[in-house]
Regions:
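C-terminal catalytic "cap/lid" subdomain
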Residues: 1-224
């Protein structure tokens, strides 16, 4: 685990995992924090973010809920997300806090807007140089459109191809695309897993086992 010390670790949590009564998420977060890995959670919506903050804090950790307007973290650009400002995330994680981000933008003029949590998680992972980006999905990974068997590993190019395949469930395509773009932006690896599986957040760090689908491979980091 020493190779991951001081690194950001982004978890895109879905509603199934956020409200699971027997979830090991809080103990996984404690484990990561105890090894100086810096988790950042992206919730599916505001109510799930509030629930996660309560659950994490009741377990003895220190979680802080954030919206996109906090420190202008998630600036709105057109109808989407602009270049994020990760300073507040870095300040919190460096001081032992676990940020829980709700996917809302900051609009300097007009109303803030809802953002897609997969897009937010990918952008945060890239901006914080995260060692991992984990996307929770009830399917537990990416099924092969031809056989329905879960795919163990994909390159970013393969993942982007599947993200455009209409045979793949629509709500999974966003996670696949975000995982691929995160890796292309410099994240070492991204996983799509079922967040309800025990210790799914950390098993890949400790073993060579993939519990879902991993996206890794060529990295294309582009400058501003």
């Amino acid at each position: 685990m020493t190779a991951f010390a001081g690194k950001a670790f982004v978890l895109r949590v879905d509603e199934n995992a956020a409200y699971a009564e027997d979830s090991t998420l809080t103990s996984d977060l404690s484990f990561l924090s105890s090894h100086n890995v810096r988790p950042i959670l992206v919730a599916p919506n505001a109510s799930a973010a509030h629930a996660l903050v309560r659950t994490i804090n009741r377990a003895g950790n220190s979680a802080v809920g954030l919206a996109g307007a906090d420190a202008a973290m998630l600036p709105q650009r057109g109808s989407g997300l602009g270049n994020i400002q990760p300073g507040i995330l870095e300040t919190l994680t460096q001081n032992g806090y676990i940020p829980v981000v709700q996917p809302t933008s900051f609009a300097p003029f007009g109303n803030d807007a809802e953002l897609h949590p997969d897009e937010v998680a990918q952008a945060i992972a890239a901006a914080t140089d995260a060692i991992r980006a984990i996307f929770f999905h009830v399917l537990g990974g990416v099924p092969d459109p031809k056989t329905a068997a879960l795919i163990d590993e994909l390159t970013p190019a393969e993942a982007l191809e599947l993200a455009a395949d209409p045979r793949v469930p629509r709500d999974l395509r966003g996670a696949i695309r975000a995982a691929a773009l995160g890796v292309r932006a410099g994240v070492e690896a991204a996983q799509i897993v079922d967040g309800r599986v025990a210790h799914v957040s950390i098993v890949e760090l400790l073993t060579q086992q993939h519990l879902g689908t991993q996206v890794t491979g060529s990295v294309y980091v582009t400058g501003d």
